[in-house]
Structure formats: structure tokens, C-alpha cells
Amino acid sequence: MFARLFAALGLLLVLAAAPAAAQDAVTVFAAASLKNALDEADAAFTKATGVKVTASYAASSALARQIEQGAPADVFISADLQWMDYAAEHRLVRPETRVNLLGNRLVLIAPRDAALDTVAIGQGFDLARLAGDGRIAVADVAAVPAGKYAKAALEKLGAWAGVEAKLAQAENVRAALAFVARGETPLGIVYATDASIEPKVKIVGAFPDGSYPPVTYPVAQTTDSRSPAAARYLAFLRSPAAKATFEKYGFNFLIMPVS
């Protein structure tokens, strides 16, 4: 009898502790291109607050659909406005918490040891000739933000028709980066921040402003979030400390930092 009583008491203590534990944790679903910078920012947040952050990185399209299917996330950071709009339209995020946090740039990369040096990217840019018999690594142009930006730029510059069949499409921008880093493709189109963290690639050209929509990373708390710490986390992302971290990795900080 006493054994059963102690077992029941132990279970009650575990259940009572569960909400408290949840208060000390935040689950973040973030675009793959944010990994290095956000990992560092999250570590600083945890050190300052004691709140554990668990981050999952993937294509924004995949993350939005996972949240829609019930995946437990407190914060969503997309690499474009469309997938955050999708989340808002499906009532997956709290609109009053949404802000455009970061910006980025689109660049052309090659393996570090490639003979290709610099390329002037502009109207009439012949990317197909540059690739030769090789392929061009990009994220999925139909769904993944980095791929959609790449397609928009290539269409604007008149290069899309010549390269569409030569694209090696990847599940996210970091996978496209890896194709070039491993030498599997001679060229790739990624964000400038991705190129900066991979020593096996180099930037050979930058796509001109106006050839693709501004790369924007909106952030919002999810509708189903039950973490009281989520609001503190969102506030931290707007802080001078977070701004310094993101800018160190090459992101543009789009909002005024809040101390």
C-alpha cells in the first residue's frame, strides 16, 4: 500500500513540475540559412535567462507545413514573406507579434579552388555558358525562399530559359551550398551569409538589387505556443546583443533594436 502511495505521489510531483519546465524552454522553427547566427544568439539568450532554446532548421516551406500539421513550435522565423503570410492566413501565428527582423543578399558561388574569379551579373547574363557542362545548385525554386529568389533574379536578367534545365535543386539553401562545397556543381546561388560561413566556396558575383524581391526574414510567435518565455525570446531577438550577432554573420538588421 505504501509503495503504491509513494508511486502516486511521485507521479503527481512530476506532473506538477511539467508546466514549470515548459516555462523554461522555447522551441524555434527557423529557416536553414539562419543556423550559425541563430545558434550563437540562442546560446547568449540561454546564458542570460536560463531559458533553454531548441531550434529546428529547414526550408521555410517545410517548417510552415509542419506547424500547420501540429508540430510543437513557439516561434517561427521564415526566410520570406510568403511563408509567413501563409502561416498568418492559416492562423498559425499571432499577427500582433510579427516583425520583419532581418535581410540578406543573393550571390553566385563557386568552389574555393575554381579558376573562375569574378563575374559581372546584369541584364543578359549568360549563366548557362559559365556553368558549361556542369549544373547550378539552387534551393527548390517552386517552394523554398532561396530558390524562389534565385528564379526571380534569373527571370529578371533574362537568364532563366537558358539555365532552367541545368539546375540542381536542393531541399534547402544549405543543401545547395553543400553541393558547391563538395565540388558536385561548379556554381550555386545562395545567400551571402551562407557563402560566408563555408570556407570551401567563394563568392564570384552578387545579383543586383531589384533583380529579386528583398530577402526578408519575418518572425512571429505561433498561435499554439504555450511557452511564457516566448515573448522574452522575441524581445531578445530585437536587442542590441542579437543585432550585433546577426550583423557579424552578414545579415541586415531591419528594425530598431530595443534595449
Region spans (language model):
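Exported/periplasmic ABC-transporter solute-binding proteins
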Residues: 23-71, 78-81, 85-259
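Sec/Tat signal peptide C-region and signal peptidase I cleavage site
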Residues: 18-22
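Bacterial N-terminal signal peptides
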Residues: 4-17
